[in-house]
Amino acid sequence: MNVEGVLTLDNVDLQGRTVLFRVDVNSPIEPSSGELLDDGRLRAIVPTLHRIQSSRVVLLAHQSRPGKADFTSMRKHSERLSEIIGRSIDFIPDVCSDKAINEIEKMRDGDIVFLDNVRELEEEYGIKYDSNQETEITDIVTRLAKVSDVYVTDAFAAAHRRSPTLTGFTNHMPCIAGTLMEREISSLRLALRNPPRPYLAILGGAKCDDSVRVAENLISKGNVDIIAFVGVTGNLMLWVSGHDIGDRNKEFIRTSLNDFFQEAWNTAKRIHDNHPEMIFLPIDIAVDSDGERIQMTLHELPTENPIYDVGIETLKLLRPLVKDAACVLWNGPASYFELPDFAFGTIEILNMCTETEAMTIIGGGHTSALVNSRGVSDQVTHNSTGGGSTMSFLSGDPMPVIASLKDSFIRFETEISDLGTVSYTHLRAHETPEHRVFPRLLVKKKGGGGGGGGGG
């Protein structure tokens, strides 16, 4: 796998280096015990950890945000990750204090430490940064940069955000995409740029504004053949197309979108009016009538009951589209699947995606969590760890973390000499302020290895 314009682990030899490894392992937590309810994101970073295990690995991560009930220490994450990989991980209950810096400096090759929740620091979460450059001059970055050689990131789920530990190391040291980040970028780029055809996108969920922006971006790329709208997004598209979905369902969409309603409506209207041949809409639905699932055709609308699922006839029409597709992108549930009586539509689409021979890309969030909970991750081509970041990527929105990786590639790739060395201005605290060269830090030449070499 190769990601254009980004340094990856295939380009580097990190043996003996101190590696800052930024991850997004933000996980659901049981309120009373503080135990992790899902370790999927921890498991997702294991391939990168295996690749850099001969380094001195310093893990950086966040859990939730200040003021939330699940804003906790990273201790439980550290303990669970240690169990998963079967190796000792030292937890440091701090981020960049003198104690934390001293512990990092004492590390030996093969050691792994896990720093505490980076969002405990105001400059990580309490400040709005207008550019990646502003994050580079923060205290957390300058202090950690003095004791580190390379920055590796698997924090794709936060790639649409900007903060010191996500985007601040660009010009301090080489910034490299980990295995997870590389796979996310590569798979989602394929969904946008050059997917196998025919290409079917199934877009649902309650975040209608995100889904219709993704749809419009896919259409603008000219690579998608059919877009099937399901879930609340499907309800919005039915409304836009002239079906009266009932005041209760209209109000739910208006309220959930709030200030974004008009923009989402306008985008949905453009899609419907300009590309009707590309749109697949439900032909029947299921509503909740006093706790009972009731099937309805569109001719029976309007309804004052909440629409919680697509109908069986809709699924019958969707199945051959999935079967005949060469690529399927699915983001967002088709139903209120947390209620057993209304899980049917979402589960059926999942079954279609696991049974097809097509390339299947699951777009993160609730859809990805469902794939994990049902143990079928190995039956889809790519199950994204992102939620908002996946939608931002597919919508064509700015991705500060990926921009940082690209900038670092330009900053350091161009300094690699024919001898396989990289000129590197980053200095450790105890070193003299001279331009420094790290032999073979950044190049594994084609057809050969890039030696583990000296440190300077």
Question: Can you say where each PLM-predicted feature lies in the sequence?
Answer:
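Conserved small/polar residues in nucleotide/adenosyl-binding loops
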Residues: 425-434, 449-456
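Short, C-terminally biased terminal segments at protein or domain edges
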Residues: 442-445
